[in-house]
Amino acid sequence: MSPSAPEQKPQLQQQQQQQQQGSSSGDSSSGSVNDSKSVTPAPSATSSTSQSSTAPSTSSDDNLICRWNACNQKFPAPEALYEHICERHVGRKSTNNLNLTCQWNSCRTTTVKRDHITSHIRVHVPLKPHKCEFCGKSFKRPQDLKKHVKTHADDSVLVRPSQDPQGGLNYRPQPPKGPSSYYDHTGQMRTNAAAFAHQAGHPSGGYYAPQPSTNYGLYFNQPPINNARTEHLGYSAAAGGYDRKRTYDMVDDFFGSAKRRQIDPSSYAQIGRSLMPLHGNLSVPNGPMTATEQYMPQPAPAPVHAGPTPSQNPLAQQYYLPMPSARTQKDLIHIDTILGQMQDTIYENANHATAGVHIHHAENGFNGYRNTPSPPTSHRSPTGMHVGADGYQPVSAASMASPMTAISSTGTPAVTPPSSSMSYTSGHSPSPSSSAMSPQSRHGSTASVMYPTLPTSLPAVSQGFGHSATTTLGPSFDGSERRRYSGGMLQRARAGPLPLPHEDTSGASTPKASESALSVGSPSSESDVSDATREREEQYDRWLENMRVIETLREYVRGRLERKEFVEDNESPQSSHSDAMDVDPKSPQAPPRELGTPREGSSLYPILRMPGA
């Protein structure tokens, strides 16, 4: 631009002369004018550039002038201006000159604290002491820098993923191994980028919810955490300690009520009411249960087996969890005996609780209480109500099944004979071309499918749950279907009284004897579920929860007995005998008496020693 400045005046004169010429020379003059314009800037352009070069210095000087009321004092640096406003105009409460109203020009912003107004003053003062380590951009307030750094954290996730070979799903974040994962735009690593590792979106931070551990038999549920958390999960024990302590107290109260015989072990109603507060609070893992609840303070064991990602046991607290009702070995044995009686009572009420409810098996659940090598099968109740994966109780038998689903010793289903099983395709029509569950591939005879055979002699119910009854016969191949066929007619059970047998209009012959035994209902939509059926489902769910809680508590007590996690009774022999809580008034047989202990009845009354005796 500077070499063309001396030629500016002659070119302007030439331009004026060319504009005064005739039309014959107009084209050539316009070309020369265009050439002069293209290489030589206008006078206004040169003046504007010179003004723009001096504008920053002038504007910076104006920004360093105090505009608080009529102060107009000029400062050499933004730091000096900011300190002047805070000390001179805002003041302090200790010097009795605190001013909480901003008087910069016409701002008039009023705050309630001195820290607030000093932070507000940064808006007016060109002071930007907070500099970004990634891009070098400066900010006036620390919260502005904090928001800006989050954008760099998101960029680092997209550009440079985590170098952690474990996938970043650790429960506790590991210390940094070498350089951090934050990089600037030139690929250079920042040394202090680890200070922002907790901001958001970093995959190697490790702030994720723990997976359920399979190493503990009794632990309490924690709310699922599906998003990244900004705080360290190592401090979550204080937040969730209230719920764990509350559940722990409920278990202790239940043990105390059972020891004091406030719960009748032979009454299913009392057992159900006492176990109701524990429903949903105790968890049974899907793996082997070893009942390693940390009763005494010790660090959580580090598992080395292969399987799901282990995590810290919620019960593995680093402090002593007292349970007064289950402290000694005698207490644990007594509680285990009472729990066994309650479990037998719940078993005895299985027929009443599971009447009319189909026992649904999960894919990875237990297929019965008996550990036999027989194949898992699904069964149907007399009314044929099926509780499917999208029904009322999705996982009603995921971890524990009813005794009705037990497998007999011969390897066949105890409830349903194999000959009465049916299969059908996705079109809800019986077809010999069913692939996986075809009756032809399992039985080899169509007659055995169309005409189920009944056993010649049925055992009594008192022989156990492994035997079948007449009213419990039904198809067994109903893994994912919602309806069944009986006699070639689309039918479904309903909760009303047993209707009259319907005649088959499809032309297929129907065995009338099996029709009466299978309690056939009229066709209806799947949404037509009566209140009685829904009530039976809820009753079955309560029975199933009672079974789960009792089994969990028994394994917890047995685990403590096996590991000898109880307080040793080192007291005198007089205090080691059974007290009033351990006496069962309903038991006809007295507890065994040990040698050297007082006779029966002495524990009920104090022994007064006479002087000199």
From Swiss-Prot:
Transmembrane segments: none annotated. Keywords: Activator, Cytoplasm, DNA-binding, Metal-binding, Nucleus, Repeat, Repressor, Transcription, Transcription regulation, Zinc, Zinc-finger. The gene is PAC1. Residues 11-60, 417-441 have a biased composition (Low complexity). It is found in: Cytoplasm; Nucleus. It comes from the Eukaryota. Residues 146-157 have a biased composition (Basic and acidic residues). GO terms for molecular function: DNA binding; zinc ion binding. Binds to DNA. Transcription factor that mediates regulation of both acid- and alkaline-expressed genes in response to ambient pH. At alkaline ambient pH, activates transcription of alkaline-expressed genes (including PAC1 itself) and represses transcription of acid-expressed genes. It comes from Gibberella moniliformis (Maize ear and stalk rot fungus). Residues 1-61, 146-186, 371-391, 406-535, 565-613 are annotated as: Disordered. Residues 442-460, 506-517 have a biased composition (Polar residues). A zinc finger (C2H2-type) spans 64-89, 100-124, 130-152. Belongs to the pacC/RIM101 family. Activated by C-terminal proteolytic cleavage by signaling protease (probably palB/RIM13) at neutral to alkaline ambient pH. GO terms for biological process: positive regulation of transcription by RNA polymerase II. Coiled coil: none annotated. This is pH-response transcription factor pacC/RIM101.
